């Protein structure tokens, strides 16, 4: 009995890419994992969309299956983005102004080149180049040169800090990322006031860093689901004999869940935990290694300044060890939309966060627990991370506004 083979209209026969006027085609094809000659898999199709969008160089990514063709349609974002630096520091309580340029698709290879700085207020400049996939399987290269000239807001001195980093990394599978960095850091005081007795006028370190990241988020900038786990270690070898070497260990975990609630658009619940531990003891650390538990980086709803904290908490704010966690509910207010190569959208956020700080690992205590809560907004623009403004409150009647990106 003869066997008749009928054509399979669900097979992917070819992949066509359209819209990449500047981006090299191999940059796009290496992100597409749907096999040719296999039936269409809608799950892989959605994952391919997310991988291309996560490159950060397209304002629109769409994949359609028509006539056995895997049709990839792209809208490239502007490659060169001017950066008007208008920044307010909660710590220095100063505005800074400057200008920069970001090339987010250098040579069409998804390389990010940035050059810019602030020239009024807190003065700094930075130049960086990042190639997330320079050769092989996700072998990356990143370099940063940074200089900052500023006043320390907590102690009476002015300093100049210089940082230079060379970093490379690779992937193991799609979710496991490893990075290795070698950097140089110098911190020199130009004026000296009332500082701790052991504080030196100059510090120089050679830093060895290692980062591991496990990432299953669907969209990096605004996840609907997935997890992000990371570990960072750093060993700083002092290049000056009378200064101590410094070791640092940190970890973080974030989880995202898309909820079903008819009164909100794409509501996402997330929670996270972060731990930071430094050695040697607090009294042997230089001032630039001190951490401050309140403010935009950790517990929102509090100041970064110890003297602005509620009575009884001052000594537990300027610390070297931190355990921090948060709960957030985020929902779309203005759906992200392509406005001619620039994507823009707004989300609303409700949050509760808490943290404990200590000067030694053995001194962690729930008696020092800080709790903050509030609401805010995230503004999504193609290219940079989202800009957020958060209005934080605490149980002691204080309120603070936190602006960050």
Model-derived regions: residue spans:
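Periplasmic polypeptide-binding modules associated with outer-membrane biogenesis and secretion
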Residues: 2-89, 100, 114-131, 247-252, ...
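Extended hydrophobic-aromatic, low-complexity segments
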Residues: 26, 335-347, 359-362, 385-388
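Gram-negative/organellar outer-membrane beta-barrel architecture
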Residues: 74-221, 227-229, 297-319, 386-405
């Amino acid at each position: 009995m003869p066997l008749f083979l009928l054509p399979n209209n669900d097979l992917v026969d070819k992949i066509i890419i359209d819209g990449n006027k500047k981006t090299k085609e191999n940059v796009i094809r290496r992100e597409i994992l749907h096999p040719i000659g296999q039936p269409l898999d809608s799950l892989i199709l959605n994952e391919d969309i997310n991988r291309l969008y996560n490159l950060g160089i397209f304002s629109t990514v769409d994949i359609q299956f028509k006539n056995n063709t895997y049709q990839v349609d792209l809208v490239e974002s502007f490659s060169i983005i001017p950066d008007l630096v208008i920044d307010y520091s909660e710590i220095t309580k100063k505005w800074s102004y400057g200008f920069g340029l970001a090339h987010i698709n250098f040579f069409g290879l998804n390389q990010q080149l940035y050059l810019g700085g602030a020239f009024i207020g807190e003065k700094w400049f930075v130049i960086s180049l990042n190639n997330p996939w320079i050769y092989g399987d996700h072998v990356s290269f990143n370099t940063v040169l940074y200089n900052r000239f500023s006043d320390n807001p907590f102690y009476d001195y002015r300093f100049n800090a210089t940082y230079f980093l060379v970093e490379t990394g690779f992937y193991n599978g799609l979710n496991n990322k490893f990075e290795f960095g070698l950097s140089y850091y110098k911190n020199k005081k130009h004026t000296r006031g009332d500082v701790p007795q052991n504080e030196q006028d100059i510090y120089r370190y050679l830093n060895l860093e290692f980062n591991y990241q496990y990432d299953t988020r669907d969209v990096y900038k605004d996840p609907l689901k997935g997890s992000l786990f990371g570990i960072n270690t750093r060993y700083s070898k002092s290049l000056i004999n009378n200064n101590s070497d410094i070791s640092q260990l940190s970890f973080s975990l974030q989880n995202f869940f898309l909820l079903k609630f008819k009164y909100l658009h794409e509501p996402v619940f997330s929670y996270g935990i972060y731990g930071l531990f430094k050695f040697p003891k607090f009294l042997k650390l230089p001032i630039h290694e001190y951490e401050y538990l309140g403010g935009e980086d950790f517990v929102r709803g509090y100041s970064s300044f110890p003297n602005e904290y509620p009575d009884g908490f001052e000594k537990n704010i300027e610390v070297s060890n931190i355990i921090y966690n948060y709960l957030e509910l985020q929902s779309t207010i203005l759906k992200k939309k392509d406005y001619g190569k620039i994507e823009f959208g707004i989300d609303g956020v409700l949050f509760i966060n808490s943290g404990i700080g200590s000067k030694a690992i053995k001194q962690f205590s729930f008696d020092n627990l800080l709790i903050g809560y509030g609401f805010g907004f995230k503004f999504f623009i193609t290219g940079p991370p989202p800009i957020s403004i958060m209005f934080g409150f605490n149980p002691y009647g204080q309120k603070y506004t936190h602006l960050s990106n």
